[in-house]
């Protein structure tokens, strides 16, 4: 099992839809200060169900939604999609790839999907119980 890709939109500093591919064996994120490395890690934690804003260096969960800049308007939604390789069958679904998506609206409503089917946080957590 390994992270295959991460797609981030409206999450923290990622105002534009950003797609990151990971290769099997990737163990580090490298880049200069302020380029978003910590926000990539926060995005992975968040899509997997992190409920503490403080664990993601934020005051409230709404703070993970892109808040705008002088040249860009704030967004009303944050969305992160994580694709995980399950070729070794370590997760309890009989498929080679599992996609988990989380979306948060400024209203506070949060939604989860597993492989395109709407799910609950409990379902996301259950995927990883035996890992």
For the regions a language model picked out, list residue spans one by one.
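Gly/Lys-enriched N-terminal cap/neck module of very large, oligomeric protein machines
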Residues: 2-131
């Amino acid at each position: 099992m390994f992270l295959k890709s991460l797609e981030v939109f409206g999450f923290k500093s990622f105002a534009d839809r950003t797609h990151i591919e990971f290769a099997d064996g990737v163990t580090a994120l490298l880049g200069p200060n302020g380029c978003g490395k910590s926000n990539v890690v926060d995005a992975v934690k968040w899509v997997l169900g992190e409920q503490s804003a403080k664990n993601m260096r934020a005051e409230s969960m709404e703070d993970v939604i892109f808040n705008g800049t002088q040249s860009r308007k704030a967004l009303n939604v944050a969305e992160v999609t994580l694709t995980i390789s399950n070729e070794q069958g370590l997760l309890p679904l009989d498929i080679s790839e599992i996609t988990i998506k989380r979306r948060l609206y400024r209203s506070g409503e949060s939604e989860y999907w597993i492989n395109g089917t709407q799910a609950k946080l409990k379902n996301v957590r259950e995927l990883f119980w035996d890992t």
